């Protein structure tokens, strides 16, 4: 350990009996006189233990001596001992027992002078169990059928039907995806999107099929290593291809890979073992018997992966693999063939245009040589000297010897430069703006981005005016803007289009640290009178101080339809007999300036992009390298400081490795779910129990180590763990057992007595009452509104969210286009999960960003949550959906019947008289207001464009019902399981 000087530990038996550097055993069982621990405790010199504070009392020393005399036995931490079934405890209230679970919980209650609460009524129970098993409330039809069923097995029939529903896997996958840190993007600042949704679908399908949990584990850890692995088994390994991946500039690919392997080790520890492994990558565990070397033994199982990023010239990286193609349908193949045919046609057209252009090359040479004239003739561009300048921001400017202006001071957020220059003599046909470098600029420039210090600029608009003596300024229209380079999604045309929006601009990422230029022709050339000035206005409206750092202006008497000749090209033109290599350079330069060719090249690029867009979908999978990597312990987790070599292995504090297991991920998966493992079944059962009751039998679901909360019902936890394994690791059988227990079926009503005796419901004296998770709240409202789509699987979906949320997030800023079809109303498990910007309503209800393994979500209560339910576009649509359902399902019903129907759809119970009265008053007051203000209903309904309804519905009634529905969806009871 990092503070341990003599390598002696007394917290674990093997270390105490072994001793430290002195090789003297701290504890010799039965012999206190020879035990170094007693020698140190009784010492009065520098070797006394404890070294600081008061010495042990005589009573404490006597206790220590008796303990050593008795054999110095250490009690092993309960979680590291194999679970065993204990006999079912006897209880007094036998009539309240429905299955073995109740023996354990009721016995604990009776020992405290307590008993179960009364059973929940049928309406509350079916809503609770439906929410727990499928994440959705029952339909009115399901509710009525259950209420009418008086058979003894009525509840069992409901549970069986829910377990067989495909909605079961969709609901329970959510918790596993939190553990798997599943997301549709890389994470970090770049946060590019990536395809891994096939793994999400695999989890849903596996849970619906009740795949035995041991097989579920093995396939995720090492499914690709199973002999003749199926597509499904390979897709399962996506579990460990979901870590974040940093592809930003400055990241070392090997460091990135090592960090991902660290993540795989710690996530495995949390998910299956309930062990906090993060600290062990740097030092041995402070509280549990896991040495740093053992961390790297597990690391070795996952260390045979290839690099998962590829570089772009050292500036940045792309996440790329390994991947596996998904089975494609005929339609995809036809689309790809059509796109490839279109690409070939464009490529032929481009080749023909190149041949035509090359035929005119000699004419171009002659014309350009004539322009240049003899050696030493005047250059094409005349540099203009600035005479006045100012900025709307806080910039100051310094005029340099080359007539450029160097910006200094703070870079304004959205600065507008106004720079006057001398006008050229004679004809003015075009102007040029150069953005030059300087040592004082970030990375030498050419921009002054103050947001993150990189040298980018975003120039939104350039305007030019002629200032003649004694006359008003004359705006000069600019056309045909050309630049030497422009960042993707930005173009030269934006400089002069007058739009002034964020994307209509010129930017130069990632071509930093080099000068750039832009040329613009005048729509009508002018001849300034002597003494005239030119006024250049440079508008930087993007924000963040992304301003030009050192502008210089030039003018020409000729249009700048072709880019200005670089000096190297001009020098070659002046040569009477250029070499073949030099002639090739001239030809290449000429072809680059051909606008027709440029347009065709863009068309070819677009066709190539389209081919890429219809590529066969793929998914991320684990792949083993042919030659295993060498694994070394890394000092303090630093990949640049490797120490001793280690082989794959497992912690000695847990069950031993079997010889028949291969020393790879597949073998490690089998070790995890071996019945001798004391942790996995306990950890998994405890986590599922928490989903039903709100808290695990062990409250620290992520930590079963020595610092964990002790189990409230240890015998129950062990009984469930063994029962789980005995039943073939069946998830559904365990869930059925919990759902049909009297413990689960109690009323959740809280009495003063229960608050006093069991305020946190640790002893399960009442049923669970919990706020729903983020996805459940949305899914619940979709089901209530009648909008829910039951379409399963496939790529992530894009429900509505506030505009522009993704605009400033991630590299290349992928656009968020809200779905307009049924994908808009699909379940939360399918919603796009972007780590840098998760779906906002999920965030508001405590959804994680999934940048790491997340074993348990928090439950907060904030005003923002109520505002989300009232005003979020998705919930507004759902409120209108519910209003339409009420009017269309109950066309001839009276008001109270409609209100009761809406209430039952929402809460699965009949409203009380006072509740009905409140809703009636709300509806009638809103209807009166809407009839008085005739435009309000139309404005409301016209604004909810995604929801279609019959023109036969009265708009005032529909709008009034919208407000009733909006209120029902925002009730605390609606978003609570009780």
Per-range role (PLM):
Residues 1-65, 69-107, 111, 123-128, ...:
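Solvent-exposed helix-loop boundary motif
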Residues 7-16, 21, 73-87, 194-196, ...:
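Primarily the internal scaffold of c-type cytochrome electron-transfer domains
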Residues 67, 154-292, 298-303, 434-436, ...:
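Extended surface/linker regions that mediate inter-domain or inter-protein docking
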Residues 92-128, 132-167, 181-228, 289, ...:
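Primarily short, surface-exposed interaction patches in extracytoplasmic proteins
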Residues 368-416, 439, 465-530, 631-656:
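Disordered, acidic Ser/Thr/Pro-rich linker "stalks" and the adjacent N-terminal cap
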Residues 415-417, 422-488, 492, 818, ...:
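Surface-exposed, glycine/proline- and aromatic-rich loop segments on solvent-exposed faces
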Residues 424-430, 528-535:
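Extended extracellular/luminal ectodomain segments enriched in beta-structured repeat modules
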Residues 433, 446-469, 533-535, 539-543, ...:
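Exposed low-complexity, polar/acidic, P/S/T/G-rich flexible segments that act as propeptides
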């Amino acid at each position: 350990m990092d503070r341990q000087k003599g390598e002696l530990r007394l917290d674990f038996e093997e270390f105490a009996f072994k001793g430290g550097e002195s090789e003297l055993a701290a504890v010799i069982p039965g012999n206190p006189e020879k035990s170094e621990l007693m020698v140190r405790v009784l010492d009065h010199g520098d070797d006394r233990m404890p070294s600081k504070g008061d010495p042990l009392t005589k009573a404490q020393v006597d206790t220590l001596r008796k303990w050593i005399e008795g054999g110095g036995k250490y009690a092993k931490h309960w979680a590291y001992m194999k679970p065993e079934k204990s006999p079912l405890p006897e209880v007094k209230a036998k009539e309240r027992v429905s299955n073995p679970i109740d023996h354990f919980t009721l016995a604990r209650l009776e020992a405290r002078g307590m008993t179960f609460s009364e059973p929940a009524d049928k309406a509350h129970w079916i809503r609770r169990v439906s929410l727990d098993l499928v994440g959705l409330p029952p339909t009115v039809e399901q509710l009525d059928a259950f209420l009418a069923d008086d058979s003894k097995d009525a509840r069992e029939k409901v549970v069986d039907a829910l377990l067989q529903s495909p909605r079961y896997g969709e609901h329970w996958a959510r918790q596993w995806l939190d553990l798997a840190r599943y997301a549709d993007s890389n994470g970090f600042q770049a946060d590019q999107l990536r395809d891994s949704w096939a793994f999400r679908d695999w989890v849903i399908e596996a849970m619906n099929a009740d795949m035995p949990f041991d097989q579920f584990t093995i396939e995720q850890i090492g499914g690709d290593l199973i002999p003749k692995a199926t597509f499904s088994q390979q897709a399962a390994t996506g579990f460990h291809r979901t870590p974040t991946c940093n592809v930003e500039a400055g990241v070392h690919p090997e460091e990135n890979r090592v960090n991902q392997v660290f993540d795989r080790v710690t996530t495995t520890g949390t998910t299956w073992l309930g062990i906090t492994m993060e600290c062990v990558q740097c030092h041995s565990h402070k509280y549990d018997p896991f040495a740093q070397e053992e961390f790297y033994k597990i690391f070795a199982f996952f260390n045979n992966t290839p690099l998962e990023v590829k570089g772009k010239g050292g500036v940045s990286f792309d996440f790329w693999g390994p991947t596996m193609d998904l089975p494609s349908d005929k339609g995809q193949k036809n689309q790809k063939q059509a796109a490839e045919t279109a690409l070939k046609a464009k490529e032929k057209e481009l080749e023909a245009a190149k041949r035509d252009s090359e035929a005119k090359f000699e004419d171009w040479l002659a014309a350009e040589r004539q322009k240049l004239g003899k050696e030493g003739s005047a250059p094409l561009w005349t540099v203009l000297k600035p005479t006045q300048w100012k900025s709307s921001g806080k910039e100051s400017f310094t005029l340099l010897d080359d007539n450029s202006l160097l910006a200094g001071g703070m870079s304004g957020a959205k600065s507008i430069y106004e720079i006057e220059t001398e006008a050229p003599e004679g004809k003015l046909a075009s102007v040029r703006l150069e953005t030059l470098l300087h040592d004082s600029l970030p990375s030498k420039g050419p921009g002054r981005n103050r947001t993150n210090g990189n040298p980018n600029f975003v120039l939104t608009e350039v305007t030019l005016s002629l200032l003649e003596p004694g006359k008003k300024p004359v705006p000069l229209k600019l056309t045909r803007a050309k630049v030497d380079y422009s960042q993707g999604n930005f173009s030269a045309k934006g400089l002069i289009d007058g739009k002034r929006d964020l994307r209509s601009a010129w930017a130069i990422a990632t071509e930093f640290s080099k000068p750039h230029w832009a040329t613009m022709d005048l729509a009508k050339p002018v001849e300034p009178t002597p003494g005239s000035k030119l006024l250049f206005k440079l508008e930087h409206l993007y924000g963040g101080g992304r301003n030009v750092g050192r502008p210089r202006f030039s003018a020409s008497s000729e249009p700048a339809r072709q880019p200005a000749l670089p000096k190297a090209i001009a020098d070659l033109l002046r040569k009477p007999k250029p070499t073949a290599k030099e002639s090739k350079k001239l030809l290449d330069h000429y072809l680059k300036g051909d606008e027709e060719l440029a347009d065709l090249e863009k068309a070819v690029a677009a066709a190539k992009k389209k081919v890429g867009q219809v590529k066969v979908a793929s998914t991320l999978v684990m792949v083993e390298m042919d030659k295993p990597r060498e694994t070394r312990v890394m000092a303090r987790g630093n990949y640049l400081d490797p120490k001793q070599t280690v082989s794959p292995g497992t912690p000695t504090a847990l069950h031993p490795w079997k010889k028949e297991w291969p020393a790879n991920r597949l073998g490690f998966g089998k070790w995890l779910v071996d019945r001798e493992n004391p942790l996995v079944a306990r950890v998994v059962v405890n986590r599922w129990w928490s989903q039903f009751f709100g808290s695990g039998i062990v409250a620290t679901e992520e930590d079963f180590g020595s610092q964990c909360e002790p189990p409230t019902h240890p015998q129950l936890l062990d009984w469930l763990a063994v029962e789980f394994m005995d039943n073939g690791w069946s998830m559904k059988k365990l869930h059925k057992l919990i759902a049909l227990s009297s413990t689960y079926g109690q009323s959740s009503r809280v009495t003063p007595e229960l608050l006093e005796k069991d305020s946190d419901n640790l002893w399960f004296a009442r049923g669970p009452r919990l706020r729903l998770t983020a996805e459940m709240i949305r899914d619940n409202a979709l089901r209530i509104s009648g909008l829910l789509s039951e379409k399963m699987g496939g790529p992530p979906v894009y429900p509505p969210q506030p505009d522009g949320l993704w605009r400033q997030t991630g590299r290349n800023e992928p656009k968020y286009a809200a779905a307009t079809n049924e994908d808009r109303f699909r379940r939360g498990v399918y919603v796009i999960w972007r780590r840098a910007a998760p779906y906002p309503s999920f965030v508001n209800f405590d959804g994680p960003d999934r940048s790491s393994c997340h074993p348990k979500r928090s439950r907060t209560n904030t005003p923002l949550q109520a505002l989300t339910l009232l005003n979020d576009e998705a919930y507004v649509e759902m409120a209108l959906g519910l209003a339409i359902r009420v009017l269309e399902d109950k066309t001839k019903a009276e008001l109270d019947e409609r209100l009761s129907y809406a209430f039952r759809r929402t809460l699965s119970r009949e409203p009380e008289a006072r509740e009905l009265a409140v809703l009636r008053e709300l509806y009638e007051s809103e209807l009166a207001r809407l009839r008085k203000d005739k435009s309000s209903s139309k404005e409301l309904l016209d604004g909810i464009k995604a929801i279609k309804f019959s023109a036969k519905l009265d708009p005032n009634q529909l709008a009034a019902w919208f407000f009733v529905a909006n209120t029902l969806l925002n009730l605390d009871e609606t978003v609570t399981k009780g």
